[in-house]
Amino acid sequence: GLAVQHVKSQLASDPQAEAAIESLGKYAKQARHCLAIGDSKKLGLLMNRSQTILSKLGVSHPTLDLFANLSLSNGALGAKLTGGGMGGCLISLTPDKPSAEKIATVLEKHGAIHTWIEPLVTLNRKGDHHDHS
């Protein structure tokens, strides 16, 4: 897609882009571990770091950046784009359902078309699902 093409062109012209991509990979592995052990605070931090990199790589969108900042300023532990990039969808990690509801309302007031609230589900080392709602 468009985001992949954009990143490929940056990799060819910007030596720091490769390090940024490597950081995203490292954060993804750490995020998986956070999900496995239920460390939502560190997961949120990793989401924020990833969003900063994605924005610098130019695959975010100003509206998604705004929504991420609004999420964080209204209680989210982390927020980052998801999907193919270049706009569209944001995930905000909140400590509880009331925080999620507050953030959904704020985002809708700022133009979000749809919001969904889903509990965080993680896997333990045996592969059993755990609902953290």
Model region roles, listed by residue range:
Residues 87:
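Glycine-rich active-site/cofactor-binding loop and its immediate structural neighborhood
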Residues 1-79, 91-133:
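C-terminal nucleotide
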